[in-house]
Amino acid sequence: MTTELQIGRVIKSHGIRGEVVVEVTTDDPDIRYAPGEVLHGRQTGREHTLTIDTARAHQGRLLIKFEEIPDRTAADSLRGTRFFAPPLEREDDEEGFYDHELEGLRIIHDGADIGVVTGVMHGPAGEILEVELTSGKEVLIPFVHAIVPEVDLEAGTATITPPDGLLDL
């Protein structure tokens, strides 16, 4: 079974010609959102297969026109659609992680298992790990080397060295 990654989400329609605003969640938008690429989307109970006609940057997001979407009304119906694709081939020495690789990792602090990564948030300043502590409390941990110096995918762990108070928030 191939793991699919979420590569974007339709935020809203844009203009009257059927463009949509897409929040991109991939490091390779030039590949994933190239004209002619076929995207597979899911939206509450529906699936879409859409071919990209044009894609252009707009205010930190992409404006995409699909061949199958003729107007704003059709574009409005795509709101909330999430696009998925299989992972791209990576070089063995390439840095970085896919969200699905981080989700489920056990969090280790001072040698103790203190929780598990339940999700990854993407923001303008970088990624943030959503962690559920063994106490049941949820915390957010910036995914930066100073705080998460080691990720061992084979062991299924991420070691953290949080500043004082981070886990108490």
UniProtKB/Swiss-Prot annotation:
One of its GO terms (cellular component) is cytoplasm. This is Ribosome maturation factor RimM. An accessory protein needed during the final step in the assembly of 30S ribosomal subunit, possibly for assembly of the head region. Essential for efficient processing of 16S rRNA. May be needed both before and after RbfA during the maturation of 16S rRNA. It has affinity for free ribosomal 30S subunits but not for 70S ribosomes. Belongs to the RimM family. GO terms for molecular function: ribosome binding. Binds ribosomal protein uS19. It is found in: Cytoplasm. Signal peptide: none annotated. The gene is rimM. Keywords: Chaperone, Cytoplasm, Ribosome biogenesis, rRNA processing. The keyword RNA-binding does not apply. Residues 94-166 form the PRC barrel domain. GO terms for biological process: ribosomal small subunit biogenesis; rRNA processing. The PRC barrel domain binds ribosomal protein uS19. It comes from Corynebacterium efficiens (strain DSM 44549 / YS-314 / AJ 12310 / JCM 11189 / NBRC 100395).
